Amino acid sequence: YVFHAAAYKHVSILEENIFEAVENNFYGTKNLVDIATERNIERFCFVSTDKAVNPKTIMGCSKRLAELYIQSVYNDLSEKKLTCPKFSIVRFGNVFNSSGSVIPLFNQQISMGGPVTVTSKDVERYFMSITEAVNLILQSTELSNDCSIFVLDMGSPIKIIDLARRLIRLSGLSEKNNENPEGDIEIKITDSIDHCFLYDNDGPKIVSTSPWTGNHEVSAATEEFSVVLD
């Protein structure tokens, strides 16, 4: 089995590093898929992102392109009646307390006396636990027989500013603001996020989609990308 979870995932950084995003998130995936196909790997699970739904960011686009390549390979091999790994694609939301997520960052800022920095008072994100993420990977890997995309029901989105306030309270401290000027930790709004990044893409949550049945334009696009990156 192959579980492919490696990727560049920081949205703001990838907006300024487009080639690196495509080279790592797309071509890194392509290389693994090609090797898995050549070596007759039984199952291949690709960890994607909910930002691949109607992608508005470079990160989302790079992951969506990787999804399309996997589906293109599956369709091509299936049409030719050739041996093919059983591909599955899982779209993650934000994983609570994972490396690089906001929770370790906020906890670090709180431990240093603040401020806790939030990009916008309106920004919202869907979250899932580490256990939910692991179960999604394992179950989708076993269930998929046709390169389906699996998405976990993550409930309602959480406002990041509310999450910051909860973490401050859980630390036994209080928020410092106009209503409580003697509080312990200030929340600073940086206003450093584009409006289109405020909300995670909303779509059906715990579903398995039908496999993509498009044509072979992905292969042509891949070759064009190769020329540009070289």
Please state what every model-predicted region is.
Residues 196-210:
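Proline/serine/threonine-rich low-complexity linkers at boundaries of modular beta-sandwich domains
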Residues 4, 8-68, 72, 78:
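Conserved Rossmann-fold NAD(P)-dependent oxidoreductase catalytic core, especially the SDR/UDP-sugar
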Residues 213-222:
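Short, solvent-exposed loop/linker segments at the N-terminal edge
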Residues 143-194, 201:
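Mid/C-terminal beta-alpha module of Rossmann-like enzyme folds, strongest
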Residues 86-91, 95:
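Rossmann-like NAD(H)/NADP(H) cofactor-binding core
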Residues 222-230:
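A short glycine/threonine-centered beta-strand motif
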Residues 82, 105-128, 132, 136-160, ...:
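A conserved pocket-lining segment of Rossmann-fold NAD(P)-dependent short-chain dehydrogenase/reductase
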